[in-house]
Amino acid sequence: MRNLWKIAIFFIVGACGFPYEAEMNQLESDTQEALSNLQGLYSSGIESDYADLERHASIARTKIFDSIHEPYFRNEFEVLKYHYRQTSRWFELQSQAGWESELSYGLEQIKALKHDAEQGLMDEEAIRVALENEKVALIPLISEVNSSCAAMRELMAEHDSLDSHWQVMWDRWENPNL
């Protein structure tokens, strides 16, 4: 009977896990998701889309304003300018390698903290402080990466149709009969 109680207590204590386990798991999951979003964005071709936008922007800069082409300047160029600025902002914020390294480092830190907590190497207060520090470092980064990736995916969804549209516009610029 005594052994049965020991086994029951062992399972009850084991089922409890360690302090802040759920929060650590959530932070680890969110960090991994942000890293996957970032890697997926680059594998889906954001760099080639940006190169196309740069090409269209450089062509647009050569066009001289005149009344014949005023609608293009008022409408088409504004759309081009918006897409180009948003995409440029993405590449100016930080490189893929920079964001990946920050997220990967954060992921390593969370895993190390989980290991220390699981092994009982830290007391509950130290775990709480370390977890809060990780949250302070990672949550703004995760938020920025996820929102930026979502915005870039939205721009990329429109890219193919806009790329074709702008190419036709350039082709017809000098020769309206095309």
Where are these regions (language model features)?
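Immediate post-signal-peptide N-terminus of mature secreted/exported proteins
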Residues: 16-77
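Non-transmembrane, amphipathic alpha-helical segments
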Residues: 19, 23-26, 30, 38, ...
